[in-house]
Amino acid sequence: MAASRYRRFLKLCEEWPVDETKRGRDLGAYLRQRVAQAFREGENTQVAEPEACDQMYESLARLHSNYYKHKYPRPRDTSFSGLSLEEYKLILSTDTLEELKEIDKGMWKKLQEKFAPKGPEEDHKA
């Protein structure tokens, strides 16, 4: 039975897309990591809580198949801000978020980072 659970999770991982713009924050990448941890021995892994494992799979499968999108359809594909899906993807990308963090830093902090000596003592203080 564990082998079939493992194969179902692998199939779900293959179908789940990975968004490269969200490095370290992507659900597809996280899902692959968790499946690798949970099934370390592959098909030979013994599942401690089979009911919880099956429930987790069913929940993820419903998300992947857009079950809730079809169950609760929206009359229009809009958001409160009026931005399009592509604009949201751009804003939520890791690169854009890093740029915003850099912009949010004050001038004094930027100067400190630029001119502060980087020595072994400095690393231990932080």
From Swiss-Prot:
Tissue: Pancreas, skeletal muscle, kidney, liver and heart.
Gene Ontology annotations of biological process type: mitochondrial respiratory chain complex III assembly; positive regulation of mitochondrial translation; regulation of insulin secretion; regulation of oxidative phosphorylation; regulation of skeletal muscle cell differentiation
Transit peptide (residue range): 1-13
Keyword terms: Membrane, Mitochondrion, Mitochondrion inner membrane, Mitochondrion nucleoid, Primary mitochondrial disease, Transit peptide
Listed GO CC annotations: mitochondrial inner membrane; mitochondrial intermembrane space; mitochondrial matrix; mitochondrial nucleoid; mitochondrion; nuclear body
Highest taxon of the lineage: Eukaryota
Entries under Pfam families matching the protein: UQCC2_CBP6 (PF20180)
Main location group: mitochondrion
Location(s), subcellular: Mitochondrion matrix, Mitochondrion nucleoid; Mitochondrion; Mitochondrion intermembrane space; Mitochondrion matrix
Disease: Mitochondrial complex III deficiency, nuclear type 7: A form of mitochondrial complex III deficiency, a disorder of the mitochondrial respiratory chain resulting in a highly variable phenotype depending on which tissues are affected. MC3DN7 is characterized by severe intrauterine growth retardation, neonatal lactic acidosis and renal tubular dysfunction. Additional clinical features include a dysmorphic facial appearance, delayed psychomotor development, autistic features, aggressive behavior, and mild sensorineural hearing loss.
Function: Required for the assembly of the ubiquinol-cytochrome c reductase complex (mitochondrial respiratory chain complex III or cytochrome b-c1 complex). Plays a role in the modulation of respiratory chain activities such as oxygen consumption and ATP production and via its modulation of the respiratory chain activity can regulate skeletal muscle differentiation and insulin secretion by pancreatic beta-cells. Involved in cytochrome b translation and/or stability.
Protein name: Ubiquinol-cytochrome c reductase complex assembly factor 2
The species this protein was found in: Homo sapiens
